[in-house]
């Protein structure tokens, strides 16, 4: 059987680890093929053209081939466009990568999610704290929606009853969206949930999702964190624990 070769594919490195003294195994997020595992032969050699560009959060165009579970990286070209994020923005980028590693199956294409990821990475590179938080919340929503883990945000999950614009609702991992109880913190009014649902529509831009997160930014952070931890099967993600440890120093 002929080996399939893919060329000029937009991609980002999610994770990399040693495979031999000179080579790396890469987890790559591609636009048309989803998350794929590739071996980069000789990438650790000082003379390798791969060495300076196989970095996380950097836009690449790659070529790869093979029909095994782990295919072979043939070429990689850096696309430029922004500098490497630093500080909190860099940790936030690693957080995005951890989410994708935990929640995306291999070889499952998500081109719209790829575009949202690319837009988020560019926003992280802007170094604005406010922009950073908005970008993270918007991407979390897009990710959960794209992989089918986000309930409709304009109806109660249990009854499918439309939301009342002024009533308050909470997003709960085990139950979806429900009306808030007196002791529920971080609830949002129905009108804000409805706006978020609209901003996640098939024709909505990522910038629409970012803007829709502005009114309930703090409340969304808590609820989305709980939902993501639930679906990732962990109490705290590694990158989030790293952030908390650094803040405690």
UniProtKB/Swiss-Prot annotation:
Source superkingdom: Bacteria
The keyword DNA repair is annotated on this UniProt entry: yes
GO cellular component: bacterial nucleoid
Keyword rRNA processing: no
Keywords: DNA damage, DNA recombination, DNA repair
Gene3D superfamilies: Nucleic acid-binding proteins, Recombination protein O, C-terminal domain
GO biological process: DNA recombination; double-strand break repair
Pfam family, one: RecO_N
InterPro entries referenced in this protein's UniProt entry, alphabetically: ARFGAP/RecO, DNA_rep/recomb_RecO_N, NA-bd_OB-fold, RecO, RecO_C
PANTHER family, per database record: DNA REPAIR PROTEIN RECO (PTHR33991:SF1)
Similarity-based family: Belongs to the RecO family.
Function recorded in the entry: Involved in DNA repair and RecF pathway recombination.
Name of the protein described by the UniProt record: DNA repair protein RecO
Lineage: Bacteria, Pseudomonadati, Pseudomonadota, Betaproteobacteria, Burkholderiales
């Amino acid at each position: 059987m002929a080996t399939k070769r893919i060329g000029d594919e937009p991609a980002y490195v999610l994770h990399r680890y040693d495979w031999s003294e000179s080579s790396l195994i890469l987890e790559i997020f591609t636009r048309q093929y989803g998350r794929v595992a590739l071996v980069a032969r000789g990438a650790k050699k000082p003379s390798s053209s791969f060495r300076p560009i196989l970095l996380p959060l950097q836009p690449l165009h790659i070529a790869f081939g093979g029909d095994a579970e782990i295919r072979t990286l043939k070429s990689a070209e850096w696309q430029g466009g922004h500098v490497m994020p630093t500080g909190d923005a860099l940790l936030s980028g690693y957080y995005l990568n951890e989410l994708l590693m935990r929640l995306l199956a291999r070889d499952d294409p998500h081109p719209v999610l790829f575009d949202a990821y690319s837009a988020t990475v560019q926003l992280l590179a802007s170094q604005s704290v406010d922009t950073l938080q908005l970008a993270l919340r918007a991407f979390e929503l897009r990710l959960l929606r794209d992989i089918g883990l986000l309930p409709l945000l304009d109806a109660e999950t249990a009854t499918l009853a439309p939301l009342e614009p002024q009533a308050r609702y909470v997003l709960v991992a085990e139950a979806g969206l429900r009306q808030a109880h007196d002791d529920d913190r971080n609830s949002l009014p129905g009108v804000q949930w409805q706006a978020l649902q609209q901003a996640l529509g098939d024709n909505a831009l990522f910038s629409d999702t970012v803007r829709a997160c502005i009114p309930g930014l703090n409340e969304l952070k808590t609820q989305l964190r709980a939902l993501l931890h639930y679906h990732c099967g962990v109490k705290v993600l590694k990158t989030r624990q790293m952030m908390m440890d650094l803040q405690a120093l």
